[in-house]
Amino acid sequence: MTRLAPTKKSVRTTSSTGNSVDLSKFNEQQKQIYNRIENLANFDCELELKDSVNVKFKNLDQAKKDEIYDLALSLKPWRKGPFLLDDIYIDSEWQSFIKFNILAPHLNLAGKCVADVGCNNGYYMFKMLK
């Protein structure tokens, strides 16, 4: 299993000297990442919701696995999670399952419509499907 660790680096709008940083390069990289995600083929997969959100792909060749791995690397830093994409474990700075597991016994979401606003990664959205 490949384990990807979170990074402590963050994007800043000023440099260490206090000068403004041109975010156009960052915005262009972001557009490239979105395009790569949109161009991914639809994969047949199984979803399993445990402490991590697990996605098991069916009939995925090594080239596609490598593409997913490279795309996952480009999405760093990972703040919330964890996620398991086939054999790629994406660790995170904040272990979202700890908080969710504390709240879950007190939540009755059956038949409810829930807006997962501001989580920045969808972890809780996936967990609320359960």
What is the predicted role of each segment?
Residues 121-130:
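Conserved SAM-binding loop of SAM-dependent methyltransferases across substrates and taxa
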Residues 77-79:
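Charged, low-complexity
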Residues 93-111:
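Conserved alpha-helix/loop element of class I SAM-dependent methyltransferases that forms part
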Residues 104-105, 116, 124:
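Catalytic micro-motifs at enzyme active sites that drive phosphoryl/nucleotidyl and oxygen chemistry
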Residues 111-112, 130:
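Short, well-ordered alpha-helix to beta-strand connector turns
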Residues 112-120:
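Conserved class I S-adenosyl-L-methionine
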Residues 83-97:
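Class I SAM-dependent methyltransferase Rossmann-like catalytic core
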Residues 1-75:
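N-terminal auxiliary segments of SAM/dcSAM-dependent transferases
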